[in-house]
Amino acid sequence: DMKVPNNGTIIGDDKNPGNMKDQAETGDYKNTSILSISLKDGERFYGGGSTSRDHIQHRGELLRMWTTYQHTEIPMPFMISSENWGIFNNTTRKNFFDIGNYQSDVFSIYNTTDEVDFYLMFGNSMPDVINYYTAITGRPYLLPKYAYGLCFGPNMLEDQFDILNDAVRFREMGVPCDLFWLEPQWMEKRYDFSTKKKWNYQKFSAEAYWDSTRYPKKENHRLLIGRLHGMGYHMGLWLCIEYDLSVPEEDALAKAMGKPLSGQEHWMDHLKNFVDNGVDGFKMDPARTIDEHPNFKYYNGHTDKEMHNLNQILLPKQMYKMMREHTGLRSWHHYTAGWSGTQHWSASTSGDNGGGRTALFDQLNLGMSGFLNTSCDVMNVNKDEELQSLHFGLFLPWVQINSWYSLHQPFYFPEK
């Protein structure tokens, strides 16, 4: 499994000015709250999202509910008991689940605020409880049919001719691939967080370079995306985002109430140009939405204490709404991070953690937390585990093979 890079930033995001963190881990103890529940002997607990990568049964563990790169990308403050009840701690602030860790017969939820808002759910079975939980936080997103086939990400040094060659050879070999996506090399500026990004016309001709300033955009059947569509493939693009996601939410509220809007741009809007070029969906990288911004004040007046975990819902929600409103269709899009509710807006992966043991625990824990569309970077494992990881990946709800810096095309492997 992949490890956290030494500089503490997201893999590939080399020019991050600094991944700052809020050093107040548990908040002001005078303004905190603890909810405690007595436990029965032998009672077991499941859920919590991707907060534990050692167990799927969490009694005896202390779980930290805070979205953190390569540690807890999709924490979900929800737990199910083998006694057919569950609890959802309805907050976006940092909180902790002590499930019989400090006291073996007590389940304590520690909130870094003096407010407590939770749901208790009782059912005839554990699936009943999950069903109640997703009734509150949102039913899992349904991807388009093609997204449940094989999604393949070529090496980030490949240009359009390499990718078209991959596409042709996949068809010749009978590889049932439905989607290719491009890593950061598709952008003119590497890791372009702005709303002014352009195609890297030196490598990719989704449109003629002389059309770069012409609007509206359209798909050209003679160029890259048109040719891939002609062979039965769909096309996705990698994205990185660092933006105040509260702006579109506040504008939506203001519009509904007949109040003035912010006048600020909405980050998702510029992606419509690429969709008009024929792009079918987007892979949302954790850079830098998953980073902490402790000194930033959001447009809605809040800080990262409330917004950090909430951002992991707002990003895929705003992607879903933009794509649905612009195309009228469900789209292929996924995001590494999450919180309770993200499952309603997007698919997910296990992030930059490979396709081995860590990914396996993530899939199981997320599944027990009502998150349906999960996957991982299949085959990003040690050499002797590659085919095992492929077999594992093909049994996931959706499957992606992410070459990124590797060469995972089947024709590069030995025949036996």
Regions found by a protein language model. Give the residues of each.
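Catalytic and substrate-binding clefts that recognize carbohydrates or anionic sugar/phosphate headgroups
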Residues: 1-144, 153-156, 160, 167-172
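Aromatic- and carboxylate-enriched substrate-binding clefts and catalytic-loop regions
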Residues: 7, 12-14, 21-28, 176-416
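A residue-level signal for beta-strand positions that form part of recognition/binding surfaces
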Residues: 84, 147, 330
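N-terminal small/glycine-rich loop or linker at the start of catalytic domains
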Residues: 136-153, 239, 245-256
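Short amphipathic alpha-helical segments
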Residues: 159-162, 311
